[in-house]
Amino acid sequence: MDFKKKPIKKKSITVAYFYEHLSSRLSIKLKKLNQVDEEKRKIYERDIHRPGLALAGFTNLFTYRRVQVFGNTETWFLNHLGTEERKQAFSNITRYKVPCIIVTNNNKLDPELVEMATEAGIPLYRTSHTTTKFIYLITDFLDDQFCHYQHYHGSMVDVYGVGMFITGRSGIGKSEVALDLIERGHRLVADDLVVITRKGESVLMASGTELVRHFMEIRGLGIIDVEAMFGIRAIRHQKRVEIVVELLEFEPGKEFDRTGLENKSVDILGVEVPLVQLPIYPGKNITVIAEVVALNYLLKHYGYDAAEEFDRRIQQQIATRATVNNPAQRAVEYFEHDFE
């Protein structure tokens, strides 16, 4: 499996898309203060900007391509200026092609400023949320929109709460293993085409595409609808990628890890994810092994590593036998424990 694909990132989203999804996905109600074409305005960055310095006249480093938020400070600053000074300060914003302006805390803008924004084609909104809460709410949404992502072939399943991405060459049986896991009570995230998105520094989230989400292709059978067949308990919309299981064809003479002391990983979008490579051949129960992989991951997560514990016992046994077979050491132990 090639995980070295170049990450994809959205270049922009329209203000119309931003407004619609804040309402539908986050239940954030924005009141429109003017009527302009929101499709023509685009947001290019995920960060938020409060343009206090720009209103004061310092626009050398004005990040106008971001969503502009007017909190109490910006609103009160404008309201305490004279009419002409207020217009001049606001024109420092409107002369740039800013995506939109959002006024928080139900603050009000002078009607003349609303008219200036309308003439400049800048959408104006108002929200009852405080500035801090509003920025917190929309930052996560914008992070989702502008984060890096890529499409990978495989099956993503939630196994005992562990996000397992099953990969391997075409036709090796990834979908069949995923289907068997679903039948045993685990949950499908996506099959065949999996969208993996990087959030923050070290979190990878997997989901399916809108078209094929929760559908599976089983060779010889065709397309099946997992949700319709197994019910809502058999699916979930997204899951964190926590371990990658690569299915490999068994090759006589090829060495595979037999102790678990060798910790392999794979780089996905700049994040290292634990990798388990499983050789397969007819009759081998990969589904049960996949469940054990998930349980073993949970044990390691909570501080217990079976391979390390087994290695420790072997080392302890070797040390004990070395002591028993050393005549000088046996003599010392004899006299130290001589109670006659």
From Swiss-Prot:
Annotated region (Important for the catalytic mechanism of both phosphorylation and dephosphorylation), positions in chain: 216-225
Which principal EC class is assigned to this enzyme? Answer: transferase
Whether RNA-binding counts among this entry's keywords is no
User: What keywords were assigned to this record?
Assistant: ATP-binding, Kinase, Magnesium, Metal-binding, Multifunctional enzyme, Nucleotide-binding, Serine/threonine-protein kinase, Transferase
The record's listing under Pfam families reads: Hpr_kinase_C (PF07475), Hpr_kinase_N (PF02603)
Question: Which residues are catalytic?
Answer: H153, K174, D192, R258
CDD domains given in the database record: HprK_C (cd01918)
Chain segments annotated as transmembrane: none
Q: Where does Mg(2+) bind?
A: S175, E217
Q: Does the keyword Transferase apply?
A: yes
- Write down the EC number: 2.7.11.-, 2.7.4.-
Q: Which reaction does it catalyse?
A: [HPr protein]-L-serine + ATP = [HPr protein]-O-phospho-L-serine + ADP + H(+); [HPr protein]-O-phospho-L-serine + phosphate + H(+) = [HPr protein]-L-serine + diphosphate
Q: Cite the InterPro entries for this sequence.
A: HPr(Ser)_kin/Pase, Hpr_kin/Pase_C, Hpr_kin/Pase_Hpr_N, P-loop_NTPase, Ser_kin/Pase_Hpr-like_N_sf
Question: Any idea which positions bind ATP?
Answer: G168, R169, S170, G171, I172, G173, K174, S175
Q: Which family does it belong to?
A: Belongs to the HPrK/P family.
Q: What does this protein do?
A: Catalyzes the ATP- as well as the pyrophosphate-dependent phosphorylation of a specific serine residue in HPr, a phosphocarrier protein of the phosphoenolpyruvate-dependent sugar phosphotransferase system (PTS). HprK/P also catalyzes the pyrophosphate-producing, inorganic phosphate-dependent dephosphorylation (phosphorolysis) of seryl-phosphorylated HPr (P-Ser-HPr).
How does this chain assemble?
Homohexamer.
Free-text note regarding domains: The Walker A ATP-binding motif also binds Pi and PPi.
Kindly provide the name given to this protein in its UniProt entry: HPr kinase/phosphorylase
